[in-house]
């Protein structure tokens, strides 16, 4: 099921002029905080329909025309990031309050790792990948790449079913964004860990508008070198405790994440020491598809 991604070192961080001017702007007296965002950025949430009919939750943060004018720009490049994690707040618009405060309306990354891009007037786009939170469809833990060497432009149909992967979702999303935002036609994609994997998929999509990517510490091979296994050895603590919540399927789109089935109050070493794998797996039953798949494939095979 999982195809090992062979990623050239040159792909790890591809920085172009798209991303080159951000440092200076943060030093020009623009302090990006929630109040500043309220004055200079708008927020809208849309469901972008992709080629198989599923809909991807997309939060779009756009500079106002007044702000673009002040910094001498008419249009903005797009910075896209994709995640399986919550990117709350969902539903709130600028000017609305959460617990009586404007703070919380904006995705927190806008004042963090995205602050330089925001100061430069970028359009910031945050998506939940399919099957997570408000995005429809079924989540698969690192979907295999099926689009082929030419990228994700063409729709592939097998036995009457449209074939999709994270690259096709990115390609279709970029098409929508180019048509529905005030942009320069230039897109960058960045992300860390899971986000790094989705950034890699964005690269493989080969959309001509994607000019720069930064897949940082990407998840790429669950069996050899990531949080599920290290060189084939099961990473029990992370897979079991983290997976007890993250691997659960959303029954329907929701702004609220799934609770964790695992509640370990004692010393975790002692907890695992006293339990065979069969007992640990029986605790989950059939509720965690990825855990069940790992138990069915203890050795490196075509699944990985």
What is the predicted function of each stretch?
Residues 181-193:
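Alpha/beta-hydrolase fold nucleophile elbow
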Residues 100-103, 107-113, 119, 144-155, ...:
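Accessory cap/linker subdomain of secreted extracellular hydrolases
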Residues 1-12:
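Bacterial N-terminal signal peptides that target proteins for export
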Residues 135, 193-194, 217:
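Catalytic nucleophile serine of serine hydrolases
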Residues 30-74:
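N-terminal cap/lid segment of alpha/beta-hydrolase-fold proteins
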Residues 10-20:
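Bacterial N-terminal signal peptides
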Residues 70-178:
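Cap/lid segment of the alpha/beta-hydrolase catalytic domain
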Residues 191-201:
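Glycine-rich nucleophile elbow surrounding the catalytic serine of serine-hydrolase chemistry
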